[in-house]
């Protein structure tokens, strides 16, 4: 039996990954992390979606220690969330240092216990948001370290790594879940479901991608299929 664990926030990217994983694996588990994030409403959204979409199990892990250690606008209400995209070589104040190191490591431990062969994460380098822990180089390096440390080949999969946000919308549409992803996920840094606040960097990236996809569906869908190998 093929099993996978999805690092699941209830946002656009991880929900799209979950939708795809449910088509590709016999058993899919979700892991969500509570680190005292500003947009904590995502945890309830993740619970609802994991149940609705049919995940085998959904585990919410308390990692509030991360909140104490990592200072970010996502962990401190006193730091405002930016409503712009960072410079290409800058790291935005929404970056939570060590977050993906911790999340992927804990997800791999869970995968080890449930005998899953893969950990799936929705990180993406194409729409680079200034997060060093979303890079392909980082994921591969951590994957190697985790596999060595556990003496087990647990594969880190990044299905969105080389597609942009418009193509991520196309992927959701390919599986017939565009409306669900648009209306029932939470990507907004300010914790507003669906189209969000419309002002933060996460909402801007999401909206721009959706508008691009809706304006030229055939072209974007074709590009997504070419990059992902889907027919």
UniProtKB/Swiss-Prot annotation:
The keyword NADP does not apply. Keywords: ATP-binding, Ligase, Metal-binding, Nucleotide-binding, Queuosine biosynthesis, Zinc. Catalyzes the ATP-dependent conversion of 7-carboxy-7-deazaguanine (CDG) to 7-cyano-7-deazaguanine (preQ(0)). Zn(2+) binds at residues 188, 197, 200, 203. The gene is queC. Pfam families: QueC. Pathway: Purine metabolism; 7-cyano-7-deazaguanine biosynthesis. It catalyses: 7-carboxy-7-deazaguanine + NH4(+) + ATP = 7-cyano-7-deazaguanine + ADP + phosphate + H2O + H(+). GO terms for molecular function: ATP binding; ligase activity, forming carbon-nitrogen bonds; zinc ion binding. Its cofactor is Zn(2+). Belongs to the QueC family. Its EC number is 6.3.4.20. NCBIfam families: 7-cyano-7-deazaguanine synthase QueC (TIGR00364), PRK11106.1 (NF008317). It comes from Escherichia coli O1:K1 / APEC. GO terms for biological process: queuosine biosynthetic process. This is 7-cyano-7-deazaguanine synthase.
